[in-house]
């Protein structure tokens, strides 16, 4: 009986880790696809703050509907949720806004490269904050995957002008992203994921709306709404893939496998964005980018295998 019980326990542990890995991969897929749709909408001339209001509001409404279907609305009365929802200022609002401003002063490739350092920052801070340590093998795979990302985002050649402001905003966005992951990973140990993420999206949407109102009323800016049905459809889709889905999946993953491991799968995001650009935006890849893609995929495959066993 003891052997049978031990075997069953090991199987449950493996299954739990497998689900965590799948959630981490799913979050990266959603963020990558969301990057592609965001690129399409913003390139069409939709205002950044306007787009964030639409995207984050849709994400909130989707999670609210999902919570109603799953009977989880009672979770919105969880003690401490109101205070915890303020982390939405850090991300999505802070990280997304700072990243977009960073792109204005530098380039999307540079901001993506800086963002790929997120697993490194989390690995450093997770030890004192979450009590997690990265194994030697996982650390090696993390470095290899980041090298792959560097090839993916830099393989098309340098683009844009790198200014000090771009560096500052990109780094601030990086710290916002890492802070959100560490704080939220700890929060979901004691509160339900769906109400937490929905509340964070709502706070971020309201912050974006406040900026939009200031820009339009005080600085006489234009609303810059989506101009066509396609732009509206893609904006709404981004609310699902860039707002609701990735945060839910990411935090669900941290409940099953170490946060330091989950963060490493985020290096898959630029790869998915690259593929999405080729498929939907007619972007052209280079051999260097394809090599980087292969490196990221192989390193993350090895990481998934290692995480499933440990």
Predicted feature locations:
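Juxtamembrane helix-entry segments on the extracytoplasmic side of multipass membrane proteins
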Residues: 16-21, 44-53, 76-81, 154-176, ...
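Hydrophobic transmembrane alpha-helices of multi-pass small-molecule transport proteins
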Residues: 63, 125, 134-156, 208, ...
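Hydrophobic/small/kink-forming positions within alpha-helical transmembrane segments
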Residues: 32, 36, 88-93, 97, ...
């Amino acid at each position: 009986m003891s052997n049978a019980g031990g075997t069953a326990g090991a199987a449950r542990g493996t299954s739990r880790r497998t689900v965590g890995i799948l959630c981490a991969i799913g979050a990266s897929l959603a963020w990558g696809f969301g990057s592609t749709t965001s690129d399409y909408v913003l390139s069409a001339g939709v205002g950044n703050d306007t787009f964030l209001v639409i995207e984050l509001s849709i994400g909130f409404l989707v999670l609210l509907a999902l919570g109603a279907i799953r009977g989880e609305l009672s979770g919105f009365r969880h003690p401490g949720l109101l205070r915890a929802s303020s982390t939405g200022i850090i991300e999505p609002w802070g990280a997304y806004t700072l990243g977009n401003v960073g792109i204005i002063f530098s380039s999307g490739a540079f901001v993506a490269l800086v963002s790929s350092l997120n697993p490194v920052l989390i690995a450093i801070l997770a030890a004192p904050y979450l009590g997690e340590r990265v194994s030697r093998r996982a650390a090696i795979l993390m470095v290899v995957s980041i090298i792959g990302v560097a090839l993916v985002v830099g393989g098309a050649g340098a683009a844009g002008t790198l200014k000090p402001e771009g560096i500052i905003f990109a780094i601030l966005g990086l710290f916002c992203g890492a802070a959100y992951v560490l704080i939220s990973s700890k929060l979901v140990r004691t509160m339900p994921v769906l109400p937490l993420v929905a509340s964070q999206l709502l706070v971020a949407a309201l912050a974006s709306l406040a900026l939009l109102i200031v820009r339009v009323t005080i600085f006489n800016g234009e609303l810059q709404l989506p101009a066509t049905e396609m732009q509206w459809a893609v904006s709404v889709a981004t609310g699902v893939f860039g707002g609701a889905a990735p945060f839910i999946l990411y935090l669900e993953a941290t409940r099953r496998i170490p946060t330091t491991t989950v963060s490493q799968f985020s290096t898959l995001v630029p790869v998915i964005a690259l593929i999405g650009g080729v498929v939907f935006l007619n972007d052209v890849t280079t051999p260097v980018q394809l090599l980087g893609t292969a490196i990221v995929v192989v390193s993350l495959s090895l990481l998934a295998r290692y995480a499933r066993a440990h």
